[in-house]
């Protein structure tokens, strides 16, 4: 089953399709975001706020979030620990 992770302001992404969550300050990341915007494969989920995390998806899409990368990573890890506990309890 696909698990959805909240990336802020009611926006969610499929946790199983996330490749990386990175900070947008580095020049190569800025170029990657600009290229994605130019090609139409960028999803801006910041609701007008400053972008603090760039989520790279398996599909090649880039998702911009106003949450910190650490916050998104904690939410993904929290989902994984809940899943592993459910599997352990089923045994």
Curated annotation (Swiss-Prot):
Disulfide topology: none
| InterPro entries listed in its UniProt record | RemA-like
> At the top level of its lineage, which domain of life is listed?
Bacteria
Pfam families, sorted: RemA-like (PF04025)
What family does the entry list?
Answer: Belongs to the RemA family.
State the protein's name: Putative regulatory protein Cphy_2880
């Amino acid at each position: 089953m696909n698990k959805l992770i909240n990336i802020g302001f009611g926006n969610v992404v499929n946790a199983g399709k996330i490749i990386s969550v990175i900070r947008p300050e580095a020049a190569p990341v800025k170029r990657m975001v600009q290229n994605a915007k130019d090609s139409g494969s960028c999803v801006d989920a910041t609701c007008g706020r400053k972008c603090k995390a760039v989520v790279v998806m398996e599909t090649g899409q880039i998702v911009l979030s106003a949450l910190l990368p650490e916050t998104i990573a904690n939410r993904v890890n929290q989902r994984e620990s809940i899943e592993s506990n459910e599997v352990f309890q089923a045994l």
